[in-house]
C-alpha cells in the first residue's frame, strides 16, 4: 500500500467515524453507480458493510440488476454524502474496479444478519417483477417453514462485492460555494497522485 493510498484511506476512515458519531441517520449509506453491458448507467443506495486496504464491501443478490451490471462491467463509483459534517457537509467519491468477495467472507457476514433478513434473502427474487405483496409474503412464509428450527444458510446467489479504489475525491463544503476538493488517483501502473481541484 503506497503512502498516498494509505493517506486517502485514513482520511476516509476519520471522516466515516465522524459521520457515525454525528447526526447522520445512516453514515454507511452510499450511492452505488454501475453501468450495464450497453453502457446504460444506474444508481441506487446501498450500505457499506466493511472497508480496509483491499477495498469497500457491500452485499447483494448476484442476479440483481446491480449484480448483473457488476459481473458484466466490473467498474463502479461510490458516493457518500454527509450533510451534517463540518461547515456545509462533506462528500466522498470512490471509483474503482469490482471483485466478488470470498465465499467465506460472504458466509460470515450472512451469518451475522438478523434471521428475518436471512429469510428475506431467500424469499426475494431481487429486481424481478412481483405480482403482489401477498406473493412476497407467501414466499417469506414458505422460507420460514423450510428453515424452522435450524440455521438459515447463505443462498448460493447472494454475496459480497468489493470496490477496489482507483480514485478518491474528498469535497469539503463551505459557505458561498467556496468549497475545497482533493483528488487521489492511481495511474495505469498503480502509482498514486494527489492534487487539489477548483471547486
From Swiss-Prot:
Any one GO BP annotation for this protein: pyridoxine biosynthetic process
Biochemical pathway: Cofactor metabolism; pyridoxal 5'-phosphate salvage; pyridoxal 5'-phosphate from pyridoxamine 5'-phosphate: step 1/1; Cofactor metabolism; pyridoxal 5'-phosphate salvage; pyridoxal 5'-phosphate from pyridoxine 5'-phosphate: step 1/1
Cofactors, names only: FMN
EC number(s) reported in the record: 1.4.3.5
Highest rank taxon of the organism: Bacteria
UniProt keyword terms in alphabetical order: Flavoprotein, FMN, Oxidoreductase, Pyridoxine biosynthesis
GO molecular function annotation: FMN binding; pyridoxamine phosphate oxidase activity
PROSITE patterns: PYRIDOX_OXIDASE
Cofactor note: Binds 1 FMN per subunit.
Pfam family, one: PNP_phzG_C
Catalytic activity: pyridoxamine 5'-phosphate + O2 + H2O = pyridoxal 5'-phosphate + H2O2 + NH4(+); pyridoxine 5'-phosphate + O2 = pyridoxal 5'-phosphate + H2O2
Residues annotated to bind substrate: 49, 109, 113, 117, 177-179
InterPro entries: Pyridox_Oxase (IPR000659), Pyridox_Oxase_CS (IPR019740), Pyridox_Oxase_N (IPR011576), Pyridoxamine_oxidase_dimer_C (IPR019576), Split_barrel_FMN-bd (IPR012349)
Residues binding FMN, per UniProt: 44-49, 59-60, 66, 91, 126-127, 171, 181
NCBIfam families assigned to the protein according to its UniProt record, in alphabetical order: pdxH (TIGR00558), PRK05679.1 (NF004231)
Protein purpose: Catalyzes the oxidation of either pyridoxine 5'-phosphate (PNP) or pyridoxamine 5'-phosphate (PMP) into pyridoxal 5'-phosphate (PLP).
HAMAP family in the record: PdxH
Family, similarity comment: Belongs to the pyridoxamine 5'-phosphate oxidase family.
Summary of subunit composition and partner proteins: Homodimer.
Name used for this protein in its record: Pyridoxine/pyridoxamine 5'-phosphate oxidase
Species, as recorded: Xanthomonas oryzae pv. oryzae (strain KACC10331 / KXO85)
Amino acid at each position: 500500500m503506497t503512502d498516498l493510498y494509505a493517506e486517502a484511506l485514513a482520511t476516509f476512515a476519520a471522516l466515516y467515524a465522524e459521520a457515525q458519531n454525528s447526526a447522520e441517520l445512516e453514515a454507511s449509506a452510499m450511492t452505488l453507480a454501475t453501468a450495464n453491458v450497453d453502457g446504460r448507467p444506474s444508481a441506487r443506495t446501498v450500505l457499506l458493510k466493511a472497508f480496509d486496504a483491499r477495498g469497500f464491501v457491500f452485499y447483494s443478490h448476484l442476479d440483481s440488476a446491480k449484480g448483473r451490471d457488476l459481473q458484466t462491467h466490473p467498474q463502479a463509483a461510490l458516493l457518500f454524502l454527509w450533510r451534517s459534517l463540518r461547515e456545509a457537509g462533506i462528500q466522498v467519491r470512490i471509483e474503482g474496479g469490482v471483485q466478488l468477495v470470498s465465499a467465506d467472507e460472504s458466509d460470515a457476514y450472512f451469518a451475522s444478519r438478523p434471521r428475518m433478513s436471512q429469510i428475506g434473502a431467500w424469499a426475494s427474487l431481487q429486481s424481478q417483477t412481483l405480482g403482489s405483496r401477498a406473493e412476497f409474503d407467501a414466499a417469506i412464509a414458505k422460507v420460514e417453514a423450510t428453515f424452522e428450527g435450524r440455521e438459515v444458510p447463505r443462498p448460493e446467489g447472494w454475496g459480497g462485492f468489493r470496490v477496489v479504489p482507483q480514485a478518491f475525491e474528498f469535497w469539503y463544503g463551505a459557505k458561498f460555494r467556496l468549497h475545497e476538493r482533493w483528488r487521489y488517483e492511481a495511474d495505469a501502473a498503480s502509482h498514486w497522485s494527489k492534487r487539489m481541484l477548483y471547486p
